């Protein structure tokens, strides 16, 4: 039987509100009006920026160490 874990499932309770806030802040910075009437390019630019910022936050949290390496 297939494992029904969605890759979009949030693993931290309550994080959806923070992600939504980040999305709307970035959209405002980029001058993008989110919604069905926006182009996929405009909406995608917001999603791409969210990804960049989340990766940057994770890198800072790990102190720049590469994934899989033990901190010495």
From Swiss-Prot:
Site (Cleavage): 25-26
Pfam families noted in UniProt: SASP (PF00269)
Keyword DNA-binding (UniProt): yes
Any one Gene Ontology molecular-function term assigned to this protein's record: double-stranded DNA binding
Record-level GO BP terms: DNA topological change; sporulation resulting in formation of a cellular spore
Domain of life the protein comes from: Bacteria
Keyword line: DNA-binding, Sporulation
Function, in words: SASP are bound to spore DNA. They are double-stranded DNA-binding proteins that cause DNA to change to an a-like conformation. They protect the DNA backbone from chemical and enzymatic cleavage and are thus involved in dormant spore's high resistance to UV light.
Further comment found in the protein's record: SASP are degraded in the first minutes of spore germination and provide amino acids for both new protein synthesis and metabolism.
Family: Belongs to the alpha/beta-type SASP family.
Protein name as it appears in the record: Small, acid-soluble spore protein 1
UniProt organism field: Halobacillus halophilus (strain ATCC 35676 / DSM 2266 / JCM 20832 / KCTC 3685 / LMG 17431 / NBRC 102448 / NCIMB 2269)
């Amino acid at each position: 039987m297939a494992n029904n874990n969605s890759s979009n499932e949030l693993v931290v309770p309550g994080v959806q509100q923070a992600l939504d806030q980040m999305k709307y802040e970035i959209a405002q910075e980029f001058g993008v009006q989110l919604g069905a009437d926006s182009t996929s390019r405009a909406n995608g630019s917001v999603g791409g920026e969210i990804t960049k910022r989340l990766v940057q936050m994770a890198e800072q949290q790990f102190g720049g160490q590469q994934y899989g390496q033990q901190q010495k």
